[in-house]
Amino acid sequence: MPLTKIEVCKRWLPVQVQTIIEAVYLAQREALKVLEGDRQIRFVEHCPEHFHIPAGKSGNYTVVEINIFLGRSIEAKRALYKAIVRNLGRVGIDPSDILIVLHEIPLENWGIQGGVLASEVDLGFKVNV
């Protein structure tokens, strides 16, 4: 159940936004074995005054921040990063313009299904992939 935020400064066309969201979602499905339809992804476009692009980066600079349950393996994380970069490359975003940050949060720090601790719920999938 990743909770994902994609932040950009560039204005993308609506169809491009959906393609970017889909690219990140498919990477999560592939690498983290996320359930089909488990798509909690927000796309945030900032105005230039509110988003500093680091030196050496282009206007396509993209930050992908993902909150996930604690427990994914290094191999799964590596596969996730590679899949995100590959998929976003198909949209025209250069690998050097992509920053990915994972926040691993223990199950007891997620309130789901009406505020129940995620550690007390049958999630329907394995976290330790």
Describe the function of each predicted region.
Residues 1-129:
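Interaction-mediating elements
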